[in-house]
From Swiss-Prot:
One of its GO terms (molecular function) is beta-glucosidase activity. It catalyses: Hydrolysis of terminal, non-reducing beta-D-glucosyl residues with release of beta-D-glucose. SUPFAM superfamilies: (Trans)glycosidases, Beta-D-glucan exohydrolase, C-terminal domain. It comes from the Eukaryota. Its EC number is 3.2.1.21. This is Probable beta-glucosidase J. It is found in: Secreted. The keyword Glycoprotein applies.
Length: 850
């Protein structure tokens, strides 16, 4: 029974910390970057142009003034360094939704420190993360990057992440401001959203992160918001972010997300990315001389760039430092913990889990023998290593049997790692030319040995290549382990031909089709088949030409340089036979794990999913296995919700996300009880896409998308209309039973590990007398605590009064904490594990700011 006097939930207002003063005075520098009148007359351009970027990842260095270059790197789940193409590997964290599922601010802080250490190893001063957009629907291509559909969970997670990054002197970047919640026509679409929804849902994560962590940088989104591109919206950048919230950091554009000269500068956009500049060279000089931009405004923009360079100099990272590997043992341990702590136990009827490592275990499914460790796009990462679910389970079990069941790939698995060069090295030879294949006696200007057969050329450069038009070949030898018909795939942003043993197998040059590859500028994967013999080395050769040689035209997408080429392939699988084999083994095996889901080809920047379904054939496999072995454990890997038409029949069901480098070990740790599952869903999982509140207004139509659900995003909608989803926000089971009393949390029924974690969620219900329609309840705070068997702990969760009670009053353009009796609900693991108490607000109060 809840006793009001025993509660330790504290509701209070908190003042933001002060922004640290600069280490040295920069006021005298700004004039050096402003074109002087004499310089204008002599047609020289000084400084304001110099404070922009030189390439995709660096700002200008100005040695005469002692101003160093600053290196910027992607991304939210790992520090890539300066190269997509043939880059240096890095540690890969679980995806954003996985981290949101942990509800663990301490873990996010530690992971932020890991990211900062990786940045230092890569010579980077600024990290482009975290991503804190809102998943208003399940189909967003970048939904996996963000933490949650809930703004408080998202903002608090971001604050802890940023604090960890800052702890080692690296500058985190909040992105993407704002409403970058879909990929369809992302540079052209206008998000039409009410001011109330903008404030309460979409800006709130940024507001909380800025208040609690003071990150040094912020990135604008590609899209428009109510008709104005975010990068040139003065109401958003100057009024809300700078004046109302007091943000002192730098505001940069997303890559090629600057669309104007004067409008962007006047709105408050400090840095155009990437370089060389399109809008801040002679065009900015012209805007200055024509009084479209004032000298003071330009000084303000320059000052912010200098302040950030100054701030990053404290980290002691040399200019243009070579990228290095880190890969420390302690980082592997932390990544494994993060992977396990992010896994949500959705169902566990009859206590099927945890599994017994002494028993023979059958592992089935398309995701069992691959590492679906990250989503696609700018969040993709070349990891130091990856662990598949099958590998993780094999480390636990005495006997493991594998059956494929079906394939789950959208594009064929990369072939590069299975090729060999002429000298027998693993991989293939990549040769670059300035002349096309028709040119006689052409010689390569560059020869590289590579293993990754997805070559995205955005940041490839060579002294002998000018412009984006050039040519390349990929050459290697493939020796199959089994004879049979193999399917090959060639995807290009450009044009390409694939030859096997001298014969043309794929023509992706003369007749091309639009696809979603390479951020939406590439083709579909064109496929061809060929019978290949085991033990024989087959010659594989790709003739590739860069993007300008293609006649395909694209609308509403970002063009990242010269394009790319992707080569995939695998043995063709008879779907019916593969399922039958898996089912037969399942019927004969007591302990069965089915690993299904998506990967970075299905969920990626550059496009949205057309539906919520799992890859073709997956549902048939799962149904058949459950029928043969009802105790089969179903493990789903996806960054956002998927349909599970067999969920009611499954006894044990686990949501495992994209778990980063240690994803396979994390899955095994939870399945076998070495880690007690404690994660909670950061997203609502609907039964069907039609049940989602954004269903009728998600994609761009005639250049706009209407946020018709208003503030009723995610669980706020399902609560309001009293519709039960498949799995609700905040759901997550444990192998242990917990009990709340007051805010004393007790572990009463330990079944697995000696230590268990419980997440306590704090929701607030508005007064019945509220003057506007409000969500039934909203998450306002949470706490994760560790417990030994039988232990009782008292938890204190502090929630600012404004965050707890306020809504945005559009009539007053202010927050309103309205008088009335609110209800605080404290929710633990289990449907009935809940406490409640009233909270009385005696006087209505308007407020602005943080």
């Amino acid at each position: 029974m809840y006793r009001q006097e025993a509660t330790t939930v504290t509701i209070l207002a908190q003042a933001p910390p002060n922004w640290p003063a600069p280490a040295f005075d920069i006021s005298g520098f700004t004039s050096a970057f402003r074109p002087s009148r004499r310089a204008q007359r002599s047609n020289t351009t000084m400084g304001s142009i110099d404070t922009n970027s030189t390439d995709a990842w660096h700002t200008f260095a100005i040695p005469r003034l002692g101003i160093p270059a600053m290196r910027i790197t992607d991304g939210p789940n790992g520090a890539r360094g300066t190269r997509y193409f043939n880059g240096v590997p890095s540690a890969c964290l679980p995806c954003g939704t996985a981290l949101g599922a942990t509800f663990d601010t301490d873990l996010l802080f530690k992971l932020g420190r890991l990211l900062a250490a990786e940045c230092k190893a890569k010579g980077a001063h600024v990290l482009l993360g975290p991503t804190i957009n809102i998943q208003r629907g399940p189909l967003g291509g970048r939904g996996f990057e963000s933490f949650s559909e809930d703004p408080v969970l998202s903002g608090n997670s971001a604050a802890s992440y940023c604090a960890g990054v800052k702890d080692l002197g690296i500058v985190p970047t909040l992105k993407h401001l704002v409403c970058n919640d879909q990929e369809h026509e992302r540079i052209a679409v206008s998000a039409m959203v009410t001011e109330r929804a903008l404030r309460e849902i979409y800006l709130m994560p940024f507001q909380l992160a800025i208040k609690n962590a003071r990150p040094g940088a912020l990135m604008t989104s590609y899209n428009k918001v109510n008709g104005l591109h975010a990068s040139e919206d003065p109401g958003l950048l100057n009024h809300i972010i700078r004046k109302e919230w007091g943000f002192e950091g730098l505001i940069m554009s997303d890559w090629f997300g600057t669309y104007s000269v004067a409008s962007a500068v006047n709105a408050g956009l400090d840095l155009e990315m990437p370089g060389p500049t399109r809008f801040r060279g002679p065009a900015l000089m012209h805007a200055l001389t024509s009084n479209k931009v004032s000298e003071k405004t330009l000084d303000d923009r320059v000052r912010k760039v200098l302040e950030l360079v100054q701030l990053t100099s404290r980290a002691g990272i040399p200019e243009y430092a070579p990228a290095q590997k880190l890969d420390r043992v302690e980082d592997r341990v932390l990544l494994r913990q993060a992977a396990a702590d992010s896994i949500v136990l959705l169902k566990n009827a009859n206590e099927v889990l945890p599994l017994d490592p002494r028993k023979k275990t059958l592992v089935i499914g398309p995701n069992a023998d691959i590492a679906a460790y990250c989503g696609g796009g700018s969040a993709s990462l070349l990891a130091y290593y990856t662990v598949t679910p099958r590998q993780g389970i094999a480390e636990k079990c005495e006997e493991v049997v594998f059956s494929q069941g079906c394939y789950g790939h959208k594009e064929l698995p990369l072939l590069g790692d299975h090729l060999k060069t002429e000298t027998g090295e693993r991989g293939y030879t990549f040769r670059v030319y300035t002349e096309p294949a028709t040119y006689e006696d052409r010689q390569p200007v560059d020869v590289l040995h590579m293993t990754n057969s997805c070559a995205f050329l955005m940041d490839y450069s060579h002294p002998k290549i000018s412009g984006d038009t050039y040519y390349a070949t990929l050459e290697g030898r493939f020796e199959p382990t089994e004879s049979g018909v193999y399917e090959l795939g060639l995807t290009v942003a450009g044009t390409g031909l694939l030859y096997i043993d001298g014969e043309l197998v794929i023509d992706n040059k003369t007749k091309q089709r639009h696809g979603t590859s390479f951020f939406g500028i590439g083709t579909v994967e064109e496929r061809g088949e060929r019978y290949l013999e085991a033990g024989r080395q087959h010659h594989v050769f790709v003739e590739y030409s860069t993007a300008p040689t293609s006649n395909l035209k694209h609308h509403g997408v970002v063009s990242f340089g010269p394009g790319g080429v992707r080569l995939g392939g695998c043995r063709k699988l008879d779907a019916e036979t593969a399922i039958k084999q898996a089912v037969q083994l399942a019927a004969e095996t007591e302990q069965v794990v089915v690993c299904v889901g998506m990967n970075g080809n299905w969920e990626s920047e550059g496009f949205d999913r057309p539906h919520m379904d799992l890859p073709p054939g997956t549902d048939n496999l799962v149904r058949a296995v459950i029928e043969a072995q009802p105790n089969a454990v179903i493990v789903v890997q996806s960054g956002t919700p998927v349909t599970m038409p067999w969920a009611d029949q499954a006894k044990a069901l686990v949501q495992a996300w994209y778990g980063g480098s240690e994803g396979g070990n994390g899955i095994a740790d939870v399945l076998f009880g070495d880690v007690n599952p404690s994660a909670k869903l950061p997203l609502t999982f609907p039964r069907d896409i039609a049940h989602n509140p954004s269903y009728l207004s998600y994609r761009s139509e005639r250049g706009r998308v209407l946020y018709s659900e208003d503030v009723y995003v995610g669980y706020r909608y399902y609560d309001k209309v009293k519709q039960a989803p498949l799995f609700h926000f905040g759901h997550g089971l444990s192998y242990t039973t917990f009990k709340l009393s007051g805010l004393n949390v007790q572990e009463t029924d330990p079944q697995a590990s000696d230590i268990s974690a419980e997440v306590v969620q704090i929701y607030v219900r508005p007064p019945t007398t509220a003057s506007v329609g409000r969500p039934v309840r909203e998450l306002k705070g949470y706490e994760k605590t560790m417990l030994h068997p039988g232990e009782t702990k008292e938890i204190s969760v502090t929630v600012p009064m404004g965050v707890a009670t306020s809504f945005w009053d559009e009539g007053r353009s202010a927050w309103l904490s309205e008088k009335g009796t609110y209800a605080i609900e404290v929710v633990g693991t289990g449907e009935r594990n809940m406490l409640s108490a009233p909270l009385c607000v005696q006087v209505s109060r308007y407020w602005n700011g943080l």
